[in-house]
Amino acid sequence: MNKKIPTIIELPKLEQEKFDALIKKYRDKYIRPSSEIVDLVLSEDKEFLELIKSKQMSLYILKLREKVWQEYLNDEIDFNAVLMKDLHKLLDTPKEILEILLSDSKIIDKKGEELVSTIKEVCGEYAGRVFPYIYRLSLSNTQSRRSRAGKTFEVIIYKVYEILGYDYDSQSKVGRKMFDSVGLGKKVDSILPSIEAFKGRRNKAIIGTMKTSLRERWQEVAEEIERTKIPVIHLLTVDESISKSKAMEMANHNIIIVTFDWVANSENIRTMKNVISFEEYLFDEIPNILKFWKK
């Protein structure tokens, strides 16, 4: 009887396109935006307000990222469950597989322990036979997690700016075209206090970019500096594996690394003048720039 069950090595093209569209639709419906989760966590946990009051910004960023990430993973679990539960309703091949498995198992004739055992067997075989769909969903989740990690970091930093009353323009706030109009590319995420300030005097504006992980991607920032002739750029990161050699190389490209206090003040890094903590960045560097514009 099993010969009647469709054998799927890869998704049929039409179903792949439909499944990809379903993933996007369900993801938008069941996974909350980073900004919504950040606001929720901050409203429910007063610890973060205390951390800001005591100027422990490294801990604030670390703990908030962890909490927001956990909320995201909870959303992802619900999203996965609902999508897989609805799979047989929405796509023909999973529907056919499940109907054959249920028919072959004669599940409607069974009761008690035999019914429970049959349900387990059907669920296991169904999961195995629709695995190409599960695999494609897993690839989508991996991609989404990468982009979500970066987006969440941005939202957290911008929320800090707002709480501290710092004016800023970001690509997500004013649009890509505004940044393009002053010659800045997509590698620049924000300007403090504003694009107008940058236009008026470049060396009295803080140009910022954010990367959760440096690896080789910081070189994209160096290329942006070279292309746009920006005097200096602040690269905010939560990457804790910053070597002295990498920091020195970035210093040669006028990149100031903004990172956790314990990283900036670690034995290998603390002598590097282009590596500063979130605390120094938020309570020294930015206020000094903003003072200039308040004259």
Language model segments and positions:
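Nuclease-adjacent, charged terminal/linker segments that flank catalytic cores
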Residues: 1-121
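Short, charge-rich amphipathic segments
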Residues: 77-98, 116, 145-156, 176-185, ...
